[in-house]
Amino acid sequence: MSGYVLLTVQLAAVLLLVTLWRAFRPNTRSNRVVSYIINVGNTPKIHQKNKADFHPRTNVEISPLVVPNLFDRWLNAHSDLPLSISRWRGKYQVPGGGERLPILTGADEIKAVFKDSGNHRKASNLNGGWVMGDLVGDGVGLISEGHWKRVHAVVSPPFTQKPTTYVPFVQSRISRHFSELYPEDEGGRTLRIKPAEDLKLLPFWVISDLLYGNLSPEMTEELLQITDLRTDVFRYAFKGGLSLFSISKIFYPDIRNKLHVFHTRWANFNRKAYQCALNRDDASACAIVTLYRAVEQGQITPTELMHTLDEALFANIDVTIGSFSWIPQFLAEDAALQSKLRKEISHARSDTAPESWVKYIGSNSTLLASCINESARLKPVTNYTYAQSMPTDRDVGGYRIPRGTFMVVDTNALNIWDDAWGSDKTSYRPQRFLEESRASFRYRFWRFGFGPRQCIAQALADTILKVLVAYTVENYELKSTGKSAANEEDAHKQGEAWFKVAEQGIILEAL
């Protein structure tokens, strides 16, 4: 009899080990089961720990609504997420990195929570697991509180200049990119492109120009090879399950080896780029010089610099081109709007003063800026923001939220479904941003974040989009391939990216 018991125990142990091993693979039953256990097991501890802090009448509601695998849908930007979920009010929750997170859906809630966003704590590695932490865990976008303030003060200057500072080199790179992309185009040619694919590396090269200046062919090739390495290892981030725990890295020697190779080549590249920039006449214009000197002076660590550069060059570019991919679709479906925008651009060009065009691009009160904002409103790059917590207890939407409670923002509920956008809230109408003051939608329009802590590169990202849209509309007539930009079935994630992009092609007829 004891033999049968021993055999049963052995079989159970083998089954458990196999289940745990398969839990490291995304989109498997084992992964979902382990993620669920972690989620359910963590929730009571979190709320029990804060029980004494709860308001006696309006505690954070532990809603019975828990949407299975919603966190995975958020990360992968799946288009099958029911739109109705964004219309539900109240505090529903989403499994996120082992916790059930309250979701913010209204402008008043956003204002109450994000008024001190500079003091918020981001979720560890953005709930992306140990691979995410190994790549960018000490980057300026992932750290919090005093750590963030110290690093931000050092690395932000190159990315927080006036938009007008960026226009000349952004415009130069965009013209160069189109000429390299279509070298045979000599005018009068009709092009058919997929913006998310054909223009994917454009923001990458713009930021490269800002950081390193004009790279040699050898350095350019090395950077492209490093990009391939980085793309490969990033596939292992945001997999959920046991990958959320650092100890799980011992099961992945191949991934650790890939990360080691990437980090070595990435550090060597930046060291060489720094040395090359020092020998240039315009060395001070290359951001890598001031940033690398900050490391030499002990203001930031080498890891903090490498992770921040990784974040700027590899992560944010995906968001930028993901945002742009929808704009040509919307403009192609509205010939009258496109014509009006072209006239505005032509009028700005007619002023021959050197600073006139730069000021036009830098302005936020133009139809050009409104077209970009309206596209970002209807097509936020993520369904939910990264989790973060407040430093103090706070009344939010009728609930007493204890300090340290991680929350996310439902970007669709805020950008699209808020009644303040009017009866045409689901329609693409850029003029709405010209009819209201910026203050009126400060807390109901998510794009670069809220409060004191927002994306440090927003001025550069906005400049890239404005110059790119202006260049496209000024030189081409945009026409649709027949699929509507509102068709969610054509929204897919780009490769291993975590955001939605427009998959439709667009027709460009040279003017």
Curated annotation (Swiss-Prot):
It comes from the Eukaryota. Residues 1-23 form the signal peptide. One of its GO terms (molecular function) is heme binding. SUPFAM superfamilies: Cytochrome P450. The indole alkaloid meleagrin was shown to be a good candidate to control c-Met-dependent breast cancer proliferation, migration and invasion. Disulfide bonds: none annotated. Its cofactor is heme. Its EC number is 1.-.-.-. Gene3D superfamilies: Cytochrome P450 (1.10.630.10). Heme binds at residue 455. Disruption phenotype: Leads to a reduction of both roquefortine C and meleagrin synthesis. Accumulates HTD and roquefortine D. One of its GO terms (biological process) is mycotoxin biosynthetic process. Pathway: Alkaloid biosynthesis. Cytochrome P450 monooxygenase; part of the gene cluster that mediates the biosynthesis of the mycotoxins roquefortine C and meleagrin. The first stage is catalyzed by the dipeptide synthase roqA which condenses histidine and tryptophan to produce histidyltryptophanyldiketopiperazine (HTD). HTD is then converted to roquefortine C through two possible pathways. In the first pathway, prenyltransferase roqD transforms HTD to the intermediate roquefortine D, which is in turn converted to roquefortine C by the cytochrome P450 monooxygenase roqR. Belongs to the cytochrome P450 family. This is Cytochrome P450 monooxygenase roqR. It comes from Penicillium rubens (strain ATCC 28089 / DSM 1075 / NRRL 1951 / Wisconsin 54-1255). The lineage of its organism: Eukaryota, Fungi, Dikarya, Ascomycota, Pezizomycotina. The gene is roqR.
